[in-house]
Each structure stands twice: as C-alpha cells, then as structure tokens.
Amino acid sequence: MSLPEDNPGTEAGGPQRARIDLSRRSVLQGGAAVAAGLSAPAVAFHALLAKPAQARRRRVSPDYGELFETFDPNTGLPLLKLPRGFQYVSFGIAFEPMSDGTPTPRRHDGMCVVREIGRQRVVLIRNHELSGGTPFGPAGTPTFTDDSAGGTTNLIFDRHRAKLLEDWASLSGTYRNCAGGCNPLGRSWISCEETTTAGHGYIFEVPAFGRASAAPIREAGRFAHEAVAVELRSGHLYMTEDADVAGFYRFIPRRRWDLERGGRLQMLRVKDSEGPVNLNGGNADRNATALARGLPQGRSLELGESFEVEWIDIPLPDPGEADPTVAEQGLALGGAFFTRGEGAWYSRGSVFFTSTDGGLAQRGQVWELDIRAQRLTLIFESPDAFTLNKPDNITVAPGGGLLLCEDGGGVRDAEDDFVRGEQLVGLSTDGELFPFAENNIIIPDGLPIGGETGDQRGKEWAGATFTRDGEWLFVNNHKPGITFAITGPWEQGPLGRRRSGKFIDDDDDD
C-alpha cells in the first residue's frame, strides 16, 4: 500500500497534516460480502520462544520510527501520535446522533471488523461498557433487561471516502459489554457481559446486519466474561474471565456456528496437576488473594515457560446466586487460574490472550495457547509500566505480530505529570515490543468531545481490529468514546502484511 506523494507526514518533530487523501487508492465499488476479522500471521511466536532473552522493548520502532502529533481532520485536534506517513480519521463519537436517530452510546470498548463488502465498505460491531441505566436505541431495539445501559452498535465505514456511512443500535439492555470476539466466518460479533450482577454475566451473538435476538448463551457460562476467540475449524469458543481469580474457558457448541442451541462449558487445567495451578506470576498481592481463598500461591515464570493442558467440564455453567461460581466449580476440579484475563484473539491454530495485571510486577502477561498441541506458553511478561502498561484488548496483525491495547492509565513521573499517554504497543514475532500509537487526547474547555474536556491521555485503548488486507486499523478510545480509522505504510514494519519482499500466506489452516 502506498500513500499519496503529497502527504509525506511530518517534518521532524512537527504535526502531520489534518486530512486523509485517498484519491490514488484503487477501491472496488460494492461487491459481495466476504469474511473479515481473521488476521493470518505467517508464524506463531516460536522464534521468540527459542530465544527468550531477545524479548525487549524498543523506545522507537526501527521500522516505523518516532511517534508525532497527528491531526484529526474531523475535530481539527492532534488526538493521536502516530509514525510518519500514517493518517487517521475519527468517527462514531459518543453522543453524536446515529442513523437510527438515537445518540451514540458512551464507553466504546471491544470491536471487530465483522464483514467487508468488496474493498470499499467495512462493517464493524462495537461494544459499549455501560452498567445500570436506561437501555439505548429506538423502539424495537432488542433489549435483554430494562434496567441496564450496555449493548452494541453496528457501523458501516467507507474506506474510499474515509467516512461513516451508517450506524445503529443492535443490542441493548445488557451490562458492562467489555470485549467479545469476532465470528471467523464473518457472520457475527459475540458480545460479553463483564459482570456477575444478578441476572447478568452472559455472552450474546450480534449479526453484521440487522439486530441481535438479545437471547443470552447461558450454557457458555455466567461469569465476568471479557473476551472470546473462536477457532475456525471447530467453532469452539475460548473465553477469558476478568476477575482476581480467573479461569480460562472453552465452550463447545452443540451445533457448529449455532451458539443459541447451547453446548458444553469447560475450564483449562494443567495436565496431570494434583490441584489448581496458579499462573499469576508470583505477585505478592495476588498471592495473598489466592491464599485468602484457600488456593495455592503462584511463582515467578520464565519467558517461554509452557504447560501441557487439558479441559474439565463445568457441571453448572449458569449458576444461581447461591450456587458455586463457574470458577469455583472449575477450581474444585483442579482448574488453572490467572489474574484478570482480558483480550483474546485466534489466529492460525493459536489463541493469544492477556492477563492485564499478571506477572511479578502486575503489569501484564501475554499467553499463547497452541490448540493442536494443547500447550499453553507465556510469550511476554511486562517488568514495568513503561515497557507495557497493563495490556487489555489484543489483536493479531496481518504481518504476524500482536497489537496490544494498554489500560494502565498512562505513565506518570513523581510529580504526577504524564511521561506518556496510553499506547498501542506492537509485539513482533522476533520478540520486540515497540510503540505504534499514543493517546494524545487533550480537549479544550468549551469544545467537548463525547461530553468530555481536558486531558484524556490516560484513557484506555480498546477494540483494535484490522481489515483483512491489512490496510486499515480500527480502534476505540474508551473515554470520551471515539472510534478511529488508521491507515498508512504498514508494510514498512512488522504489523504489515508485506515483509522482506514476500507476502504473508492468507491460509488460516496450517
């Protein structure tokens, strides 16, 4: 992909121009809908695991270079810092009217490119992490309960014109829709309730077009669901849990791709273990939490350390308030546990997921589950906030690396001044961590965006998702609630599809 020659980005240290010029792109008009949301890296992280000492953070990507203030053509503000040559546009901002006549909900969170129509139009489904309150959407919007304000919105984005074409409420009346997962056939988004509030704690399926049924998938478990990664061949769902003592789960549908017919819920267990195994990385605070619940302490883990795993059935996947929780049931059967499971993404036979405050420093772990080998491996652990600050949502980039959304509040000095805002951080298959983008949102008084003014640089990134050809990255700012579309010379670095003169294999099967 090449950018227009008249938009070279920044001069050294200067802001990039506030416009998107796509006139030289060759874009098909219309076309049939195709599957999306399936990044296909060439390799897993075996190269990294073979040489764990090489896993390190670079201050600047040697391929993409420094980050510069880059202006948004819609707001006129430098909301993001990006490498030279990259451009973006904001859209779908909280409180702006949607196509169905209702205000855009706040708290943008998990998201996925669910379908693509030719090479021009992209269908996104986006979560809104809202709790109690009035459901959003016009009359007729599918609503789970009448006292919850969370849900999902669908958006159609025109790549050729870099603008939002249409958006609407697709699910409402749910509670704290945090992350979720894309259906690999491009049919739907699976939205997760991150709560165990009475009557909530389920996952819901939302179609690319139209609206959801608002029927919870009860047999997939009632717990603080965070994210879902769907394996292509089997249709199995791999799910994270956001809790201090959190399981990692597999849901086997009775009928492939028909989630509402139910299925079997299982929890991951370290094979041949004599009881629960604590994989929190040995942090003292988290070990105290485990001990208080009668669970074993964790220990520090080596980069590349791996565990052969198996799965145990959960007897009661939809427990009532007086019943043992899903995690308690699994732990009683020897299940493994983490701390605050967050983002998850499937690609080429592996599920990658994060533990946002896992590890000795409580700044985050990144795990890989090799489905065929049934082996779980620690591929990264952050030693401090500057290296990686509590990874949350995650996606696999077309070039094979991971892109991690930070949710640690930014990095501040002793005087509480920002050293840097929250970042989108790349992790290459060679084990190098590097900054790709930085939250630079500072909104002037009297000109609110999403109902907010002031310094928002510490607010989290969420919902990172690429188009299948790798030319566009869509990502959310949780608060004030903005969706960004980013494009540029991806092929220059490890996130891009083109590497060393060769194209990454698109085949998702090994």
What are these model-derived regions, one by one?
Residues 1-23:
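N-terminal secretory signal peptides
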Residues 14-20, 26-49:
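N-terminal export signals
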Residues 78-95, 99-107, 115-121, 125-163, 294-378:
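Beta-propeller domains
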Residues 103-112, 334-343, 390-393, 450-468:
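Signature of short aromatic-glycine-proline-rich micro-motifs recurring in repeat-based ectodomains
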Residues 356, 386-432:
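Loop/turn-rich, solvent-exposed surfaces of beta-rich toroidal or solenoidal domains
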Residues 380-392, 433-463:
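Conserved blade-ending motifs and adjacent loop-strand segments that build the rim/top face
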Residues 465-504:
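Blade-level signature of beta-propeller repeat domains, shared across WD40, Kelch, NHL, RCC1
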